[in-house]
């Protein structure tokens, strides 16, 4: 077996998790900033804005979880070995 395959799999697993978490991280930061700005503009809508803000990161984190699943597949059930 070529020793480069396990090494490349570890690097690919790290890149999968790292790159998969960049987008949701930026998205959650933007969403939180816009929510604070919206609450500052309309304090009476705080409840609606907060409810939406607390439910939306669950869908954003799905991308990070997909990256983690790919990394775990490359680490433990490596299809290249």
From Swiss-Prot:
It is a multi-pass membrane protein. Pfam families: ATP-synt_C (PF00137). The keyword Secreted does not apply. InterPro entries: ATP_synth_csu_bac/chlpt (IPR005953), ATP_synth_F0_csu (IPR000454), ATP_synth_F0_csu_sf (IPR038662), ATPase_proteolipid_c-like_dom (IPR002379), F/V-ATP_Csub_sf (IPR035921). CDD domains: ATP-synt_Fo_c_ATPH. The record marks 61 as: Reversibly protonated during proton transport. One of its GO terms (cellular component) is plasma membrane. The chain crosses the membrane at residues 3-23, 61-81. It is found in: Plastid membrane. One of its GO terms (molecular function) is lipid binding. The keyword Transport applies. Keywords: ATP synthesis, CF(0), Hydrogen ion transport, Ion transport, Lipid-binding, Membrane, Plastid, Transmembrane, Transmembrane helix, Transport. Belongs to the ATPase C chain family. F-type ATPases have 2 components, F(1) - the catalytic core - and F(0) - the membrane proton channel. F(1) has five subunits: alpha(3), beta(3), gamma(1), delta(1), epsilon(1). F(0) has four main subunits: a(1), b(1), b'(1) and c(10-14). The alpha and beta chains form an alternating ring which encloses part of the gamma chain. F(1) is attached to F(0) by a central stalk formed by the gamma and epsilon chains, while a peripheral stalk is formed by the delta, b and b' chains. In plastids the F-type ATPase is also known as CF(1)CF(0). NCBIfam families: ATP_synt_c, PRK07354.1. F(1)F(0) ATP synthase produces ATP from ADP in the presence of a proton or sodium gradient. F-type ATPases consist of two structural domains, F(1) containing the extramembraneous catalytic core and F(0) containing the membrane proton channel, linked together by a central stalk and a peripheral stalk. During catalysis, ATP synthesis in the catalytic domain of F(1) is coupled via a rotary mechanism of the central stalk subunits to proton translocation. This is ATP synthase subunit C, plastid. It comes from Aneura mirabilis (Parasitic liverwort). The gene is atpE.
